[in-house]
Amino acid sequence: MELHQLKSVSKSRNHKSKVVGRGHGSGLGKTSSRGQKGQKARKSGLTRLGFEGGQTPLYRRLPKYGVANKGILKKRWVVLNLNKVAKLNLKTVTRATLIEKKVISKKNNLPLKLIGNTKLTTPIHFEVQKISKNALNAVQTSKGSVKIIT
């Protein structure tokens, strides 16, 4: 059997859809297959998703969780690790030099924070907004300097 030999089963294509609510003679007049009275018989009778007949629905009985704006007030930083900075072989580390070396994006306006406790072999001058105690000790032991920018 092939596709062009297929035929429809008898009476399967004879079903015509009827327009409801157009008089008794149409077959679906008066109540338009909605039954007699009640909420579902009315024009706006369909209930919303989760409706439980006036009872407090489940989505309102359960507690809220997962606040959407949790980190919106949190201070964010671009964290620089001494390991990565030492591999760049720079004498001074500023936002401009980091953008030039493509360590951070030009669009990134977040303040810089220096962390880590790697021993530096050469003295490096840093210009950052914040620095950890360990990173400050590591920079000072290598005879480098740190300028805190506000």
From Swiss-Prot:
Designated name of the protein: Large ribosomal subunit protein uL15
Sequence ranges of Basic residues compositional bias: 10-21
Subunit structure: Part of the 50S ribosomal subunit.
Function recorded in the entry: Binds to the 23S rRNA.
Keywords: Ribonucleoprotein, Ribosomal protein, RNA-binding, rRNA-binding
GO cellular component: cytosolic large ribosomal subunit
Gene Ontology molecular function: rRNA binding; structural constituent of ribosome
Family indicated by similarity: Belongs to the universal ribosomal protein uL15 family.
Source species of the chain: Mycoplasma genitalium (strain ATCC 33530 / DSM 19775 / NCTC 10195 / G37) (Mycoplasmoides genitalium)
Record Gene3D superfamilies: 3.100.10.10
Disordered: region residues: 1-49
UniProt xrefs under SUPFAM superfamilies: Ribosomal proteins L15p and L18e (SSF52080)
A Pfam family hit: Ribosomal_L27A
A GO biological-process term: translation
